[in-house]
């Protein structure tokens, strides 16, 4: 597998506040562990979007991992041309910084937002340009990623397409492991 689509919860859907929120540290830890596993299986490209939450955290994690795995590439694909233009200025600035850091950035639609068809075209693009997906989503805790989950399931009925679904129980396991590692690091410092 060489191209992985990573997406999931938006930051507001899991109640994170500020860049130092412990939930964000756990999410980034989980992303890092999962991307490392995929690197051992031949991962070359991570494709994600620019949404606040899992997608932007993924870009930050992959950019950090590139220090040890320089062959790893990350692409930010956006559904339409003016993506993020309605956000708060600090969120817009963060998006711009991430755009400058990735290996490739483009919009699937080169028009400004016209309607939900652009989002569906974006999903189709991501499915057709990746070999598998990693989705941070739990059907019992709905969020906008439910639309990606549904389209991936539909795609799987037509063609083999591996999906790794990280639910809340698995996130709790990552939180426990992360907490134990932090306590161990604090003990030995």
UniProtKB/Swiss-Prot annotation:
Family in the record: Belongs to the UPF0398 family.
Highest taxon above the source species: Bacteria
Transmembrane segments: none
Protein name (record): UPF0398 protein LCK_00599
InterPro entries: YspA (IPR010697)
Gene source species: Leuconostoc citreum (strain KM20)
Pfam families reported for this sequence: YpsA (PF06908)
Family matches, as HAMAP family: UPF0398
């Amino acid at each position: 597998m060489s191209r992985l689509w990573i997406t999931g919860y938006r930051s507001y859907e899991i109640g994170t506040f500020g860049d130092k929120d412990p939930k964000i540290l756990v999410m980034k830890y989980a992303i890092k562990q999962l991307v490392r596993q995929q690197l051992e299986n031949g991962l070359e490209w991570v494709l994600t979007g620019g949404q606040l939450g899992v997608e932007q955290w993924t870009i930050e994690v992959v950019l950090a991992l590139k220090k040890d795995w320089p062959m790893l590439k990350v692409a930010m694909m956006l559904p339409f041309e003016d993506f993020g233009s309605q956000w708060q200025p600090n969120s817009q600035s963060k998006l711009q910084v991430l755009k400058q850091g990735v290996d490739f950035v483009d919009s699937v639609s080169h028009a400004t937002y016209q309607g939900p068809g652009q989002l569906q075209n974006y999903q189709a693009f991501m499915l057709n340009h990746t070999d598998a997906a990693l989705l941070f989503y739990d059907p019992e805790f709905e969020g906008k990623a439910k639309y990606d989950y549904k389209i991936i399931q539909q795609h799987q009925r037509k063609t083999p397409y591996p999906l790794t679904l990280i639910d809340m129980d698995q996130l709790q396991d990552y939180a426990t492991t992360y907490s134990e590692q932090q306590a161990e690091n604090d003990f030995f410092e």
